[in-house]
Structure formats: structure tokens, C-alpha cells
A protein has these predicted regions:
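FAD cofactor-binding and catalytic pocket of flavoenzymes
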Residues: 327
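Conserved ASCE/P-loop NTPase catalytic core
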Residues: 1-322, 331-333
């Protein structure tokens, strides 16, 4: 413990401004006053264990959680894609590919459809010209101009209808990229504090046009949740007691299965009929809160974290030592 007043102690420190103070490269080393929690963070990142941090607001819990992403390997990151299901349109298929390939697959598929659409348009145009020529010859022989006009109207309508149907059917074959990653990216850090069920667990958007050829395919309306976006990374939830018990139970299921299907969360929405295959969500959960908040957690969820992870009580104050005073200077810098 340092008894010397801060003003006198600062006179013994040789620097002109905080720009001269060296800053650690890693985020975990920039956290001050939480040495024990920093050690646990390193272990949890290495062992891929869940964590529950208990402490007052403003004690560095979210910063410690974000620091885990720098300590985790990024070799296994994946893109998650959603495909149309020919057998059941309300159960879209889910596939994963290495990070960076999903965007390329979608672009390649769009290019293939563009080329196919051009070939189809040329074929339809050739057929339309043949039919138009036949109508013209028939009109010349019969001398009835109304027959030609009526035939051309039917021909134009049929051409546009067939072309639009083919284009819409082709577009529905393009997969949707639910979770996009890039090669070399750090593992994701997703802060899901205060999110609703749809944002946390995923949702299916409502389709106002559900028939008549104007409907949107189910796989295009699927939206990934925070648990899916955190696949391969860290999911941070502060004040976890604010989640309803049903949402905490679903979160526990996702942690256990490492995959969770996406379904419509609103009973009055057309998306309620849609439920995808299980979507990968292998994440590290870092939950946080104060003592009162933790007491209102789902018992099974807390038991899972304590049994297969770490429960840490973060410090609310730090000792007045010379080392900690230097760390405060670094924090200001």
C-alpha cells in the first residue's frame, strides 16, 4: 500500500504526456484491477468453457468477455447458408461452408441464373417470332386484321407471363447467407444484452403476400439470431435475469446441443409455420449480472455454467499500490 499522496507520487513518474505510456497489445492485458478474472478468462478461452461473472456495473465484465475472442483460435469459422427445401418449403435446409465461401457460392449461383435467363429469353423470343409470323401469314390469307391483333395480344401476354414465372422460380433457388464470415477474421463477439426473443434465438419474417405467385420463399425470410451469429465465438449477455425463463431454457438447449432451429416467434405471423433445420451455434456464453440478478436465473442454466464452466466474482475496488497507480495512468492513456 502506498501512503504517499498522489500529487507527490506523480512527481516521481518521468513522462510528459500519456502518449508516452506503453499500451499492451492484447485487450485482456489492458484490463486493470481484475487479475484473477483475467486468469480465468484465459483458461475459459483455451478450454472453451462458459462463464458467469458476478459484480457491480462498470467493473470491466464486457471488456473481459470481449478479450476472450483474442485468445480463441479462428481456424474453424464457418459461413451458414439457408437453402430452399423441395420436399417441405416450410422447413428450409441449413448447410455450413468454410468462412468466405458462402458469399462466393451465392455470387456464382446468381451468375449461373443470369446466363440461364439469357438463354431462356432468347429461346422464348425465337418461339414468339415464329408464332407471330404464323399469325401474320394466317391474317394475310384470311384478311381479318382483328385476328392478328388478338393473337399478338395473347402472344405478348403469354411471353411476359412465362418469362416472369421462370425468373421467379430461378430466384427462389438462390441460397440465403445467414451468417457471413471472412477468412482470417477473429472469432465473433456478440453482445446480446437486452435483446428480444427473435433477436436472440432467430426469427422468420412475416410475408404479407402469401399466395398468387407474389409470396417470398420461406428460406429468404429466415433471420439468424445472436446465438447463431456467435457461432465459433463469444455470446455476452449482461443482466441475464432480464431474459424470460422460456428464453433462458432455449438458450440452455442451444448450449447443450450446439445447434438450434430458427422458427417464427410471432403466432400471428405467417413465419410461425416455418421452422428450419438445426442451425449451428457452438458459442461460449459469458453471462453477467449482480448478485440480485443471478438469483433470478434459471436454475438449470446456472447449474450448467457452474458445472461445465467458471463462476467468477469480479472486484469492485483495487488496492492503492504503486503498480495499480501505474495501471491507472495506462488506463487514462
Amino acid at each position: 500500500i502506498v501512503d504517499e499522496p498522489i500529487d507527490q507520487w506523480l512527481e516521481s513518474i518521468s513522462f510528459d504526456s500519456t502518449a508516452e505510456v506503453p499500451i499492451p497489445d492484447t485487450l485482456v492485458d489492458q484490463v486493470i484491477g481484475q487479475e484473477d478474472a483475467s486468469l480465468v478468462i484465459r483458461k475459459a478461452a483455451e478450454q472453451r468453457r462458459h462463464m458467469l461473472m458476478i459484480g457491480d456495473p462498470g467493473t470491466g465484465k464486457s471488456m473481459l468477455a470481449k478479450a476472450m475472442t483474442e485468445l480463441m483460435p479462428s481456424e474453424s469459422l464457418e459461413d451458414t447458408m439457408c437453402y430452399m427445401n423441395d420436399d417441405d418449403e416450410n422447413e428450409p435446409r441449413i448447410r455450413t461452408v468454410p468462412a468466405g465461401r458462402g458469399d462466393r457460392i451465392v455470387k456464382d449461383r446468381r451468375e449461373q441464373l443470369r446466363e440461364q435467363r439469357e438463354r431462356t429469353s432468347r429461346t422464348l423470343m425465337f418461339v414468339a417470332l415464329l408464332i407471330g409470323a404464323a399469325l401474320l401469314i394466317a391474317t394475310i390469307q384470311s384478311g381479318e386484321i382483328i385476328t392478328l391483333l388478338f393473337g399478338l395480344f395473347i402472344l405478348a401476354f403469354g411471353y411476359m407471363f412465362i418469362k416472369n414465372r421462370l425468373v421467379s422460380n430461378d430466384e427462389s433457388r438462390i441460397p440465403k447467407l445467414l451468417v457471413k464470415r471472412k477468412r482470417g477474421d477473429m472469432p465473433p463477439f456478440i453482445d446480446a444484452t437486452g435483446t428480444l426473443a427473435g433477436s436472440l434465438l432467430g426469427d422468420v419474417r412475416h410475408d404479407p403476400f402469401q399466395s398468387g405467385g407474389m409470396e417470398t420463399p420461406a428460406h429468404e425470410r429466415v433471420e439468424a439470431g445472436a446465438i447463431h451469429k456467435a457461432h465459433g465465438g463469444v455470446l455476452f449477455i449482461d443482466e441475464i435475469n432480464l431474459l424470460r425463463l422460456e428464453e433462458q431454457q432455449a438458450l440452455l438447449t442451444a448450449m447443450q446441443e450446439r445447434a438450434f432451429p430458427i422458427s417464427g416467434r410471432s403466432e400471428r405471423s405467417s413465419g410461425a409455420l416455418t421452422k428450419t433445420e438445426a442451425v449451428p451455434c457452438d458459442f461460449i456464453l459469458v453471462a453477467a449480472g449482480n448478485l440480485d440478478a443471478v438469483q433470478h436465473m434459471h436454475p438449470a442454466l446456472r447449474s450448467r455454467i457452474r458445472g461445465y464452466g467458471y463462476e467468477v466474482y469480479v472486484n469492485s475496488n483495487m488496492r492503492d499500490t504503486a503498480r495499480n497507480r501505474r495501471r491507472l495512468i495506462r488506463f487514462i492513456a
